Every structure is written in structure tokens, then in C-alpha cells.
């Protein structure tokens, strides 16, 4: 009160310092970097008054810097765990042709439905459009191929394409997601011991899960160790010549 009543230079410095401290605190909440640069410029220009404002605003800056990264770190950590882990296990594979397969099958099914919708009209105009029997056979064969054969062939070729693959490490089980006939997601659960590698190379089969053929791309596994464990390549390789010779002798005796 004495300083304010005297109106001396100290009182003016205190009033100016208080105003600048409030400005620094408010700007620090909006943009910490701008507040630091502004405080440094004020300190260089005004000397003692700027230094007082910077020292008063420093705890606010430290508090903002200490709090924001912690919140970001928690948010990133939570989102990371939610994406990687689910009820089916850990996502280890995602097919890059899932949308392509879905789109091609949808187009094939739509053309089949359109052909079936126009069949009554075509049957009604049969005698008018086609006069000869060979033309009728050719026309109906073409419609039949687009209506039945093409969707069936596409489903046969893509029924084993794996959209997503999950792995449960505790039970060492896998869950493969594929497309069904009606384009709904179908799950196949199998153990690692159920995986069988075909003796010869197949275009649309990478391995057999029990009796179901599945197709995956080894290059799309983010972790190559997951693919090696799936195929059983991480197991120790044992080859007993005596057992092989005994089996061969038994076959020859039979």
C-alpha cells in the first residue's frame, strides 16, 4: 500500500509486472511456444520487469508441458491396445484384396439377379426373337453361365481367401475370417497342430486348417515370426531315416 500510495517507480514496476504475468499465463495456456518467445523478447527489452514476468509464468509453462504429453501418451497407449487386441486374439494378418474380392462377387451376383429378373420377359418373347433352335441354345447357355456358373466359380476360387487372421497365444489357436456364399464373414477356428502344408504348390491354397484350404500372402504379415509359427517353421526339424525305411518295408510287404 505504501508503494502504491507513493506512486514511485517500484509501484509502476509491480503493476506492469503483474499485468505481464497475467498475459503470459493466459498465452501459455493457448500456445506455450509463443509465450516463451514473447517472454524472452520482453526480458531482453525491459530487463528487470520482463525477468519478473518470466519467472512468474515459468511454473505455468512447466505445468502445461508436464501435463499435455502425459495425456497424449495415455490416449495413444489406450488406442494402441484396443486396435491390436480383441476378443478373438491378436490381429496378425490382414488381406489387401478383401475389398476387391467383395466387389467382384457383388458385381457377379448383381448381374445374375438382373439376368433372372429379365428371364420371364425373354421367355415370353422367345418365338419372336429367336427362330432357330441353335440360337436359343446359345443364348440360354450364355445367360446360364452368367447366372450360375460365374458366381459359383468365383466362390470356389475365393472361398479360402483370408480377410483377417487372429492368434490367441495362450491356447495357440487361430481364427481365420473368410467370405461365405452370401458375402458374410465366416470364421474358422483351428489349432496350430491342425495346420497342414500341401505337398505340391497350389495357386489358391497356402495351407490346410484341418480340411479347409486357406490362402494368405506371407509378405503381408507385419511380423514374419507369426507366419513362421503359423506354418510350423519354428519347430525343430527331425527326420528319422530308420522310421522311413521301416515304413517303406511295411509297404513293400503288403
Swiss-Prot record:
Organelle transit peptide: 1-78
Membrane topology reported for the UniProt record: Multi-pass membrane protein
Residue ranges annotated as Mitochondrial matrix topological domain: 79-112, 158-254
Compartment(s) where it occurs, according to its Swiss-Prot or TrEMBL record: Mitochondrion inner membrane
Residue ranges crossing the lipid bilayer per the database entry: 113-133, 137-157
Keywords of the record: Membrane, Mitochondrion, Mitochondrion inner membrane, Transit peptide, Transmembrane, Transmembrane helix
InterPro entries on file: TMEM70, TMEM70/TMEM186/TMEM223
Main location: mitochondrion
Mitochondrial intermembrane face residues: 134-136
Biological process per Gene Ontology, one example term: mitochondrial proton-transporting ATP synthase complex assembly
Any Gene Ontology CC annotation: mitochondrial membrane
GO MF entry, a single one: mitochondrial proton-transporting ATP synthase complex binding
The protein's role, per its UniProt record: Scaffold protein that participates in the c-ring assembly of mitochondrial ATP synthase (F(1)F(0) ATP synthase or complex V) by facilitating the membrane insertion and oligomer formation of the subunit c/ATP5MC1 through its interaction. Therefore, participates in the early stage of mitochondrial ATP synthase biogenesis and also protects subunit c/ATP5MC1 against intramitochondrial proteolysis. In addition, binds the mitochondrial proton-transporting ATP synthase complexes I and may play a role in the stability of its membrane-bound subassemblies.
Xref: PANTHER family: TRANSMEMBRANE PROTEIN 70, MITOCHONDRIAL
Sequence similarity: Belongs to the TMEM70 family.
UniProt subunit comment: Homooligomer. Interacts (homooligomer form) with ATP5MC1; this interaction facilitates the oligomer formation of subunit c/ATP5MC1 (c-ring) and the c-ring membrane insertion and also protects ATP5MC1 against intramitochondrial proteolysis. Interacts with the core subunits TMEM126B, NDUFAF1, ECSIT and ACAD9 of the MCIA complex. Interacts with ATP5MC3, TMEM242 and TIMMDC1.
Identification of the protein by name: Transmembrane protein 70, mitochondrial
Organism: Bos taurus (Bovine)
Amino acid at each position: 500500500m505504501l508503494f502504491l500510495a507513493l506512486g514511485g517507480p517500484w509501484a509502476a514496476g509491480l503493476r506492469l509486472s503483474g499485468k505481464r504475468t497475467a498475459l503470459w499465463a493466459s498465452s501459455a495456456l493457448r500456445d506455450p511456444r509463443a509465450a516463451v518467445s514473447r517472454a524472452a523478447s520482453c526480458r531482453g527489452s525491459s530487463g528487470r520487469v520482463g525477468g519478473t514476468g518470466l519467472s512468474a509464468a515459468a511454473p505455468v509453462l512447466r505445468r502445461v508441458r508436464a501435463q499435455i504429453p502425459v495425456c497424449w501418451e495415455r490416449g495413444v497407449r489406450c488406442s494402441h491396445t484396443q486396435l491390436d487386441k480383441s476378443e478373438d486374439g491378436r490381429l496378425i494378418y490382414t488381406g489387401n484384396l478383401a475389398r476387391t474380392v467383395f466387389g467382384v462377387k457383388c458385381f457377379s451376383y448383381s448381374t445374375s439377379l438382373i439376368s433372372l429378373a429379365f428371364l420371364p420377359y425373354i421367355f415370353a418373347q422367345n418365338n419372336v426373337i429367336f427362330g432357330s433352335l441353335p440360337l436359343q441354345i446359345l443364348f440360354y447357355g450364355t445367360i446360364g453361365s452368367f447366372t450360375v456358373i460365374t458366381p459359383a466359380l468365383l466362390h470356389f476360387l475365393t472361398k479360402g481367401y483370408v480377410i483377417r487372421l487372429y492368434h490367441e497365444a495362450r491356447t495357440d489357436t487361430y481364427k481365420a475370417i473368410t467370405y461365405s456364399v452370401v458375402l458374410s464373414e465366416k470364421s474358422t477356428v483351428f489349432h496350430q497342430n491342425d495346420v497342414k502344408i500341401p505337398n505340391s504348390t497350389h495357386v489358391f491354397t497356402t495351407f490346410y486348417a484341418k480340411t479347409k484350404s486357406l490362402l494368405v500372402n506371407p509378405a503381408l504379415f507385419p511380423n514374419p515370426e507369426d507366419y513362421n509359427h503359423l506354418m510350423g517353421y519354428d519347430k525343430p526339424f527331425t527326420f528319422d531315416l530308420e522310421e522311413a525305411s521301416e515304413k517303406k518295408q511295411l509297404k513293400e510287404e503288403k
